[in-house]
Amino acid sequence: MKNLRNRSFLTLLDFSRQEVEFLLTLSEDLKRAKYIGTEKPMLKNKNIALLFEKDSTRTRCAFEVAAHDQGAHVTYLGPTGSQMGKKETAKDTARVLGGMYDGIEYRGFSQRTVETLAQYSGVPVWNGLTDEDHPTQVLADFLTAKEVLKKEYADINFTYVGDGRNNVANALMQGAAIMGMNFHLVCPKELNPTEELLNRCERIATENGGNILITDDIDKGVKDSDVIYTDVWVSMGEPDEVWQERLKLLKPYQVNQALLEKTGNPNVIFEHCLPSFHNAETKIGQQIYEKYGISEMEVTDDVFESKASVVFQEAENRMHTIKAVMVATLGEF
């Protein structure tokens, strides 16, 4: 699979089914090698820049540990750590970093920014999250589902419940279409994905033997699901009126025990990209409770802590799948 060498990883839509399967298989191989102590560093003497406009726990740790395991050196540039967007354009930053580093990870706001970095840096660029997409997350989600369910990807009934327009929902729909999955997106009509993205994903799903269903009918949408997935309903910094409207729309779509039972599948698993507002024990969770009287948002605490929940295995797999992306695009095989 040498054709992934020097490729950027900006969106799953840039990759074929065979290429995504290769990345997932490589993730399994690298994970196994790490566990049994036979991992071989394939990124020796590589220098990697982590460019973060948004803070993160999982994405930063996954990239740093993966790079260290593989022998690479990392420079972390946080939200105040570079001049990009303030005194320097993304195009100029790309050319500066591209002259010093062998690869660049970007986590921030605009998909256009990560595309600009890839266009002008001359080195592989990896999308750690934008407002529109989150491709590295989906690799971890799919790997976890396969590990736990013991099913091939095309045999998994994958259901996302919640805000159908957000970056994780977008990325999951893309990935499911590419892998030929049966994918359900259960959300209020007001929060459906864009027609443009939906039409493109439906075409890809048809080509790969998959299926996509968009519905606001919870009973219909979750029936026979193997995976129930959700994400946060709102983002920090959005105005109060947006919060109120979003909470009103999404409250019926909370992932709780009753919703899991509607799947009719006693072995259904629960996934979440994290962090999650499943209780009021965080600063923001407490603020939400005080302002809106809600102690559990997108998922209830009992589901989050249940045997169905695989969120921490999923979080670990961020590291293994991100390692696979870096090795495949930058490594010396």
UniProtKB/Swiss-Prot annotation:
Record-annotated residues binding L-ornithine? Answer: N167, D231, S235, M236
Superkingdom of this entry's organism?
Bacteria
GO terms for CC? cytoplasm
Q: Where does carbamoyl phosphate bind?
A: S56, T57, R58, T59, Q83, R107, H134, P135, T136, Q137, C273, L274, R318
- Top EC class of this enzyme: transferase
User: Known InterPro entries for this protein?
Assistant: Asp/Orn_carbamoyltranf_P-bd, Asp/Orn_carbamoylTrfase, Asp/Orn_carbamoylTrfase_sf, Asp_carbamoyltransf_Asp/Orn-bd, Orn/put_carbamltrans, OTCase_ArgI
Q: Which residues form a coiled coil?
A: none
Location in the cell reads: Cytoplasm
Q: What is its EC number?
A: 2.1.3.3
Q: What's its catalytic activity?
A: carbamoyl phosphate + L-ornithine = L-citrulline + phosphate + H(+)
Q: In which pathway does it act?
A: Amino-acid biosynthesis; L-arginine biosynthesis; L-arginine from L-ornithine and carbamoyl phosphate: step 1/3
One GO biological process from the UniProt record? Answer: L-arginine biosynthetic process
Which Pfam family is an annotated match for this chain, by its short name?
A: OTCace
- Keyword Iron: yes or no? no
- Quick one: where is this thing mainly located? cytoplasm
- Keywords associated with the record: Amino-acid biosynthesis, Arginine biosynthesis, Cytoplasm, Transferase
| One GO MF term | ornithine carbamoyltransferase activity
Known role:
Has vitronectin and fibronectin-binding activity.
Family note: Belongs to the aspartate/ornithine carbamoyltransferase superfamily. OTCase family.
List the protein's name: Ornithine carbamoyltransferase
